Amino acid sequence: MAHNINRQQSESLFTPRNAVLHGDCIELMRGMERESVDFILTDPPYITRYRGRDGRTVANDDNSRWLRPAFNQMHRVLKDGGFCVSFYGWNKVDLFVDAWRAAGFRIVGHIVFRKRYASCAR
């Protein structure tokens, strides 16, 4: 069955509705409209001073200065009824919970993964 669509409908079919942004998350979100995001999935530094077996480290994993500003912006851009999923370091859960609550998030649950190799935390 064929459907007739006009030019405007045709163009809207190919207009991107999703985007991947690369940059400092706090700065990027400051430029976004309030309540413009449906879903956030974030895997931020865990504040554990991670060091892999090969000596690799993670930027900003040695301090929590970014934590509250980042989650404040996430809460600001997230639509009412939107959903945010955040990974976090289990031994720093108190810092993450404080930041989530201070931003206005309501915690509804935790998901625990069984990993064969978990990095050590100092």
Question: What label would you give each PLM region?
Answer:
Residues 2-122:
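Core catalytic lobe of class I
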